[in-house]
Amino acid sequence: MIYSGGLATYCADAQATADLLRTHDVVVVAGNVEERLSVGVKHCGCGFNEGSACDVLASSRYDHAGHTIYKETNCWMGSLPHIATFTMSRAHLAVAHGGVTQTNRSIFPATPDEDLRRELQLSGTDGVIAEHSEIPYSRQVDSQLWHNAGAISMPANDRTLRLWYTVVTPSSDSIYIKIQALDFNWRGAVAKIRAAGLSLACADALESGLWPRDKIISSDDQAQPGRPLTESALKWSTRGVMPKPKSQRIAAP
């Protein structure tokens, strides 16, 4: 199991989330939040416009995490890799939080092929799995894969009270990539947010399934906010992939 970063700034259970991931030996990739908490930076660096509703929301969550996460956990965050790699069905895959070289880059479903091709080339892999844009989707560019796993901690702006994750299953000549929805106790999460005094925009997003309107998102992707997403799957052929040495888990940058 791999978690693609951002564990500290959603809802009110930052320390408990970190403890859960570590207890179960989940591979965690550093997002912009982990990078900054580990060195004591005062802003999350999520990439939102200064003073926007999303910036205020993110700052509220980040400040709460900064005050509740243990020092030892911050040190652990500083040891996390920026990219984790593994080999499956001969394909060499990378897991990043946002972009390959820019941790807080949001890559949305309507991102041009040229941009994805550049990111994939920089990765040096056959495919990349990321998360920062929080919308689950799969794109094939030439024979390569760009996949956004969705967020396990925030609805996907589709007006449903669900979270998203991805299951990848290997076969001899392909990888089956399934985007799955997760129902969760949103009422309990909202109650904790309110009790902790976090920005109400965070609670509103969980209750409505919609993000603040000023969230940075491409015009094409923003055209249909609130349209319910459906679970989907892609069978990605790895027949043309050149075999590579088996990758090990990365435990440090």
Which stretches of residues belong to each language-model region?
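Conserved hydrophobic/aromatic beta-strand scaffold that supports enzyme active sites
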Residues: 83-85, 95, 138, 165-167
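Metallo-beta-lactamase
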Residues: 57-92
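Active-site-proximal segments of metal-dependent phosphoesterases and phosphodiesterases across multiple
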Residues: 48-56, 89-123
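Anionic-ligand binding region
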Residues: 113-152
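Active-site neighborhood of phospho(di)ester-bond hydrolases with catalytic His/Asp-centered motifs
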Residues: 1-6, 27-32, 96, 127-132, ...
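Acidic, His/Gly-rich catalytic cores of divalent-metal-dependent hydrolytic chemistry
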Residues: 140-253
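Active-site environment of divalent metal-dependent phosphoester hydrolases
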Residues: 9-12, 33-39, 127-140, 154-157
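Core catalytic region of metal-dependent phosphoesterases/phosphodiesterases
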Residues: 1-65
